[in-house]
């Protein structure tokens, strides 16, 4: 006999519409390809504990586990585009703690700190109002440029972090000459340049000539690498447009200092290590 407690288990608090419209997904990524009414649950105790594990946060595993717990229709969080991931995590925050996120900003005029609330549903609206694909044309080819997947974004962040750490380690080596340090750092700089190059190319979802469509990453990478530099520049410009479209908007803040009252715009950003903390 089922326990009466089952009727008190978590229920969806909100239903979301994915900004990407599921353009790159299949049924292995999201159940039934439902991208317009995605049920989002609040976090449970285990979710909160996972988000307090530094190694799991750094690897991206904590976020992936929380998404699978709070949004069970997402079957493979690693394949979710970053624009959708940010949207979903904001949704989880709303479902868990409510519509508002307390923030503290610094007045650029008097340097006083001001506490205010960020209205999270308006951020969700901002995400869904954006076109998820940038289309470019080059020599008769049509390219679809989309946000990175969470998997690729996480890998790039980890690789970049490790390379920056290596550069710092080289500088701290007292047994190396300046020439030896420069040689080692040049190797890292080349790797960073290649990482930046590949980051741009990972935004290319497909290339079409009107009759055929190529989505294989290896084929796309090889083609762009062997094409005129103009193609790469077009892709890079399109990725910058996407980044700006899905960046968190600046918020208007009135300085709390009675002698100032300056109204300023403040940038917002989310650090997922503390985004889900309860703040008063």
Features from the language model and the residues they span:
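Long C-terminal interaction/binding lobes of large macromolecular proteins
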Residues: 1-280
């Amino acid at each position: 006999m089922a326990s009466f407690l089952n009727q008190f288990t978590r229920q969806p608090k909100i239903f979301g519409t994915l900004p990407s419209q599921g353009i790159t997904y299949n049924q292995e990524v999201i159940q039934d390809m439902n991208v317009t009414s995605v049920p989002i649950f609040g976090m449970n105790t285990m979710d909160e504990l996972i988000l307090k594990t530094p190694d799991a946060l750094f690897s991206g595993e904590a976020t992936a586990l929380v998404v699978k717990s709070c949004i069970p229709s997402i079957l493979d969080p690693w394949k979710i585009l970053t624009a959708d991931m940010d949207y979903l995590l904001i949704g989880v925050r709303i479902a868990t703690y409510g519509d508002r996120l307390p923030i503290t900003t610094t007045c650029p005029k008097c340097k006083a700190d001001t506490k205010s609330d960020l209205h999270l549903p308006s951020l969700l609206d901002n995400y869904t109002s954006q076109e998820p694909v940038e289309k470019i044309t080059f020599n008769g080819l049509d390219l679809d440029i989309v946000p990175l997947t969470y998997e690729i974004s996480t890998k790039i962040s980890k690789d970049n972090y490790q390379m920056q750490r290596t550069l710092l380690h080289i500088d701290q080596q007292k047994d190396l000459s300046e020439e030896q340090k420069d040689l080692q750092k040049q190797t890292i700089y080349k790797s960073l340049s290649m990482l930046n190059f590949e980051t741009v190319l990972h935004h290319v979802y497909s290339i079409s000539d009107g009759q055929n469509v190529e989505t294989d990453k290896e084929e796309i990478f090889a083609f762009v690498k062997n094409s005129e530099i103009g193609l790469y520049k077009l892709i890079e410009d399109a990725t910058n447009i996407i980044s700006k479209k899905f960046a968190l908007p600046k918020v208007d803040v009135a300085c709390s200092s009675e002698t100032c009252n300056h109204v300023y715009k403040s940038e917002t950003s989310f650090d997922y290590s503390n985004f889900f903390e309860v703040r008063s």
